[in-house]
Amino acid sequence: MFDRNKILQLIGVDVWRLRMQKKPPLNDKSKDSWVTLQNEVKSCEQCSLHKTRTQTVFGVGDSKADWLFIGEAPGMDEDLQGEPFVGRAGGLLNEMVFSIGLSREEIFIANILKCRPPQNRDPLASEVAQCLPYLERQI
């Protein structure tokens, strides 16, 4: 296993501060809360993106991982498979994760938006505002 600070320094992140205190492990209700959050995302209709999605892209990996990777929004492949970073960007992310001695199963991967914007356009500020509470709960 690599040292987190050394890895961050190697990729150009010179200053790293934990912004939140580590919290004690959640009780058994945390699993229920995670499932509840997944169901809320799955049934979300807060913005117009729900009309054009194939499915939501909640996130994948270890929900209690030390490493969290956040993308902007799902693309076509992610929308079809329901998993973030599965296209070319996913291959690159897999290589990056592997290079620091981790596997995809040891991290958590999510997007800010949980639905694909049409024609892979950039997310609108209003869409980000609607999805951000979901991401904050995932974090």
Enumerate the language-model features and the residues they cover.
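A polyanion-binding, active-site-adjacent surface
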Residues: 2-139
